[in-house]
Amino acid sequence: MTAENFLWIFIGLVIFNFVFTTVLEYLNDKNWKNDIPNDLKDFYNAENYLKAKNYKIERGRISSISSSLSLIISLAMLYFYGFGFISDYAISLSDSIIIQSCIFFMILHLFTHILGIPFSYYSTFIIEEKYGFNKTTLKTFIADNIKGLIISSVIIIGLTSLAVFVIDFFSAGYWLSLIHI
């Protein structure tokens, strides 16, 4: 099997996942009942149930827009050699395969995080505010984003370093070492 075949399989799986998730989200939103299900009548009054339903549907729309943008950007990155450009850049900064891999994934992570901020902001300060769920201030929002970025970066760097070390250490037979983990 050629690299091009793997690329097309990967693209097909990404598109399938997007379509499958979008259809499921649509079907879930479409099948919300206006009347409270009997199992929930003890927990919700009609007004709160309708509020929860509308909130969920509105958040789903933002999620769909975000997912669509992610798909378009991912496909554009593949088509226009964006991932290769990032890889070449990472390679130019270090001779260490571990550092190169960490730089590559951190650039992708930063890019993804920055693209997600407007959607997160809208969800928090527009949608949650509309339904009375928002208790977040702009200062808290910014602090949470910075903390989340730092924590996720530490995790990404740690896992990437470990994975690349194992692959590099065991070379061609690295997958055999995974059986023993």
Predicted region positions:
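Alpha-helical transmembrane segments of polytopic integral membrane proteins
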Residues: 16, 25-29, 83, 120-124, ...
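Membrane-interface segments at loop-to-transmembrane junctions
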Residues: 56, 130-147
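Juxtamembrane "helix exit" motif at the C-terminal ends of alpha-helical transmembrane segments
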Residues: 72-93, 156-175
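Transmembrane alpha-helix/interfacial motif
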Residues: 4-34, 59-77, 104-114
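Membrane-interface amphipathic/juxtamembrane segments adjacent to transmembrane helices
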Residues: 25-59
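Hydrophobic transmembrane alpha-helix segments characteristic of membrane transport
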Residues: 112-135
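Conserved small/polar residues in nucleotide/adenosyl-binding loops
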Residues: 179-181
